[in-house]
């Protein structure tokens, strides 16, 4: 990697963030595309967020990525938001356009790009969970022309989830169906008519648990996706594959959301296939 007076910085900003795989991905991409850039991880306190955003202009950076807890907190300090960032209410990428700071959310785009030969337009989706990742997948699906979405959360989370779905409907005219995860017969019925089933919860990170009961029967053509990539094969994905369904883990989402950010910063395509090889070697 070349570092000189012309090197431009990009960074991921969060707390905690030292474990992040983003520097690995982006520095590989800078190198592979002969871009004079360097990508670092900044673990900051909330009180330093304003100054951190100011540094994007001050040091003429490409921009920054954001992770928890700053995806929403950063919004007041930006000049403009993209459509999907406005819908989601969260930003994971800030682009420095000649001193203008524009907030994007590439998570949803990254998720749909990682699905093998699948487009969401005109399709039906069942989504488990309603946290940050789920919101980005939801909003992107609506922007991309999904025909129906069923969101399942635990009954204790229904009240907390509804206002966001109401806001989405207000902004897009699209009504998302909200259901309780405990109603297994409803879950089975919705999955039976879906084209895509997504686990956007953290259930399965322990390598033991699954967000759905194992007696659920999956339709043959259903594509199953999990946003988790550690473990590489969650119990949820193992269960889907045991029924003969194609199943995708969350590593592709991580890579393709990074590729979207990289393109916004540099105007260049990230060599995703090459980086995918390195990532799978690292995590498989």
From Swiss-Prot:
<dbReference type="GO" id="GO:0004764">
    <property type="term" value="F:shikimate 3-dehydrogenase (NADP+) activity"/>
</dbReference>
<keyword id="KW-0560">Oxidoreductase</keyword>
<dbReference type="InterPro" id="IPR036291">
    <property type="entry name" value="NAD(P)-bd_dom_sf"/>
</dbReference>
<keyword id="KW-0521">NADP</keyword>
<dbReference type="InterPro" id="IPR013708">
    <property type="entry name" value="Shikimate_DH-bd_N"/>
</dbReference>
<feature type="binding site">
    <location>
        <position position="227"/>
    </location>
    <ligand>
        <name>NADP(+)</name>
    </ligand>
</feature>
<feature type="binding site">
    <location>
        <position position="67"/>
    </location>
    <ligand>
        <name>shikimate</name>
    </ligand>
</feature>
<dbReference type="GO" id="GO:0009073">
    <property type="term" value="P:aromatic amino acid family biosynthetic process"/>
</dbReference>
<dbReference type="InterPro" id="IPR022893">
    <property type="entry name" value="Shikimate_DH_fam"/>
</dbReference>
<feature type="binding site">
    <location>
        <position position="229"/>
    </location>
    <ligand>
        <name>shikimate</name>
    </ligand>
</feature>
<feature type="binding site">
    <location>
        <begin position="129"/>
        <end position="133"/>
    </location>
    <ligand>
        <name>NADP(+)</name>
    </ligand>
</feature>
<dbReference type="GO" id="GO:0008652">
    <property type="term" value="P:amino acid biosynthetic process"/>
</dbReference>
<feature type="binding site">
    <location>
        <position position="107"/>
    </location>
    <ligand>
        <name>shikimate</name>
    </ligand>
</feature>
<comment type="pathway">
    <text>Metabolic intermediate biosynthesis; chorismate biosynthesis; chorismate from D-erythrose 4-phosphate and phosphoenolpyruvate: step 4/7.</text>
</comment>
<dbReference type="GO" id="GO:0050661">
    <property type="term" value="F:NADP binding"/>
</dbReference>
<dbReference type="Pfam" id="PF18317">
    <property type="entry name" value="SDH_C"/>
</dbReference>
<feature type="binding site">
    <location>
        <position position="92"/>
    </location>
    <ligand>
        <name>shikimate</name>
    </ligand>
</feature>
<dbReference type="GO" id="GO:0019632">
    <property type="term" value="P:shikimate metabolic process"/>
</dbReference>
<feature type="binding site">
    <location>
        <position position="83"/>
    </location>
    <ligand>
        <name>NADP(+)</name>
    </ligand>
</feature>
<comment type="similarity">
    <text>Belongs to the shikimate dehydrogenase family.</text>
</comment>
<dbReference type="GO" id="GO:0009423">
    <property type="term" value="P:chorismate biosynthetic process"/>
</dbReference>
<comment type="subunit">
    <text>Homodimer.</text>
</comment>
<comment type="function">
    <text>Involved in the biosynthesis of the chorismate, which leads to the biosynthesis of aromatic amino acids. Catalyzes the reversible NADPH linked reduction of 3-dehydroshikimate (DHSA) to yield shikimate (SA).</text>
</comment>
<protein>
    <recommendedName>
        <fullName>Shikimate dehydrogenase (NADP(+))</fullName>
        <ecNumber>1.1.1.25</ecNumber>
    </recommendedName>
</protein>
<keyword id="KW-0028">Amino-acid biosynthesis</keyword>
<dbReference type="Pfam" id="PF08501">
    <property type="entry name" value="Shikimate_dh_N"/>
</dbReference>
<dbReference type="InterPro" id="IPR011342">
    <property type="entry name" value="Shikimate_DH"/>
</dbReference>
<feature type="binding site">
    <location>
        <position position="250"/>
    </location>
    <ligand>
        <name>NADP(+)</name>
    </ligand>
</feature>
<dbReference type="InterPro" id="IPR041121">
    <property type="entry name" value="SDH_C"/>
</dbReference>
<feature type="binding site">
    <location>
        <begin position="20"/>
        <end position="22"/>
    </location>
    <ligand>
        <name>shikimate</name>
    </ligand>
</feature>
<feature type="active site" description="Proton acceptor">
    <location>
        <position position="71"/>
    </location>
</feature>
<dbReference type="InterPro" id="IPR046346">
    <property type="entry name" value="Aminoacid_DH-like_N_sf"/>
</dbReference>
<keyword id="KW-0057">Aromatic amino acid biosynthesis</keyword>
